[in-house]
Amino acid sequence: MNTNYPILEIKNLKACINENEILKDLNLKIHKGEIHAIMGPNGSGKSTFSKVLAGHPAYNILSGDILFKGSSILNLDPEERSHMGIFLAFQYPIEIPGVSNEDFLRLAYNSKQKFLNKDEVDPISFFTIINEKLKLVDMSPVFLSRNVNEGFSGGEKKRNEILQMILLDSELSILDETDSGLDIDALKIISKGINTFMNQNKAIILITHYQRLLDYVQPNYVHVMQNGKIIKTGTADLAKELESKGYEWLK
């Protein structure tokens, strides 16, 4: 699906942290119904890119623009961007001691409901909603009573991130190395959740080092990032080429 305007358009974006310029004239267009993979060596700017999209306050925009559904989001804080439909799955999900997963997820869900001028849901109604979503990431309802990410395995933390994405029904999801540290079984579960969630009204950005995630989640485009900009774009075959050749041949 290719709508008249991109769901996300990044124009000549320059961004820095502590006066260190990391993103350098970055350009990218993503339409609804598309999955884009972003690959690149360590230090290429991939994680900075994801945090800048989500509105992380540590990063400063030097020039350029980020348009989401045709409107600039540079002046919006992370919560506003989230309510508009942007979701970031962290590479290293944080633990929140003393807060149950169910309470955390219900708070996030009701916060978005309020933003959309929809009725908030009570705990009983929410349990019915979340129970259906749990099945998509192969998790037991027992998981809801545990504190957020506390004592979770790496795979459980990543599944929890995908669960949040599904629950919030985000239009643009940025998955920052969601596949890192996963065994093959966990990778398959995560991929199933992503593929079930994806449709023609959504777009996903996969940030990854490895081809293996792309064996299960088929991207429409693969971009290579180096030194803060996209230096090459191709199909899923580009990821396979990178797997066999590395990044040196692109220099």
Swiss-Prot record:
CDD domains: ABC_FeS_Assembly
Residue ranges annotated for the ABC transporter domain, each copy included: 8-250
GO cellular component: chloroplast
SUPFAM superfamilies assigned to the protein according to its UniProt record, in alphabetical order: P-loop containing nucleoside triphosphate hydrolases
Record bears the keyword Nucleotide-binding: yes
InterPro entries xref list: ABC_transporter-like_ATP-bd (IPR003439), ABC_transporter-like_CS (IPR017871), FeS-cluster_ATPase_SufC (IPR010230), P-loop_NTPase (IPR027417)
Residues the record lists as binding ATP: 40-47
Compartment list: Plastid, Chloroplast
Molecular function (Gene Ontology), one example: ATP hydrolysis activity
Alphabetized UniProt keyword annotations: ATP-binding, Chloroplast, Nucleotide-binding, Plastid, Transport
Similarity comment: family membership: Belongs to the ABC transporter superfamily. Ycf16 family.
Protein name: Probable ATP-dependent transporter ycf16
Organism field: Trieres chinensis (Marine centric diatom)
Gene: ycf16
